[in-house]
Amino acid sequence: MKTREQKIISAWTKSNALYTKAAAILGVSYPELMVLYALQTMGELTQKQISESFALQKQTVNNVVKSLVQSELLQLAASQADKREKILLLTAKGKAYAQKIVLPLLKAEGRISQSIGEEKLQVMCDVYELFNLLLEKELNEGLQYEP
């Protein structure tokens, strides 16, 4: 029998696997889907913001960004807050591409949200955020490894 913690990890892993499957169905890699998803749903972001929000390696995000820039789907602009950082901006071609890729997933998420209900979704989000906050605290305080 699985413990609650194992169920949480299992559900999280399964969700990631399903988003990876969605990316494959949509004809992109998981990291590309997450970058497009971020830009489509959250607007102008930096690579760092995407990396942190979606738990992607900085180099992975950088590789996706380079590919999207090369394909003329994305352009980079200097950040007003920090000139060392670049803001990622979808081009007109990029906006159309991102919508084509991300919209089917957003519609599916919308149908799922309706099935689950707002209250349950809010509880799920709150509990998951709390779990992550407490796990991060534990990690920052140092795990006790015993060989």
Residue ranges and their predicted role:
Residues 17-60:
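N-terminal helix-turn-helix DNA-binding core of bacterial DNA-binding proteins
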Residues 119-147:
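C-terminal regulatory/oligomerization modules of transcriptional regulators
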Residues 1-26:
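N-terminal leader segment of winged-helix/HTH proteins
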Residues 66-126:
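Charged, amphipathic alpha-helical coiled-coil/dimerization segments
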Residues 15, 19, 72, 98-101, ...:
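Hydrophobic recognition helices of helix-based DNA-binding modules
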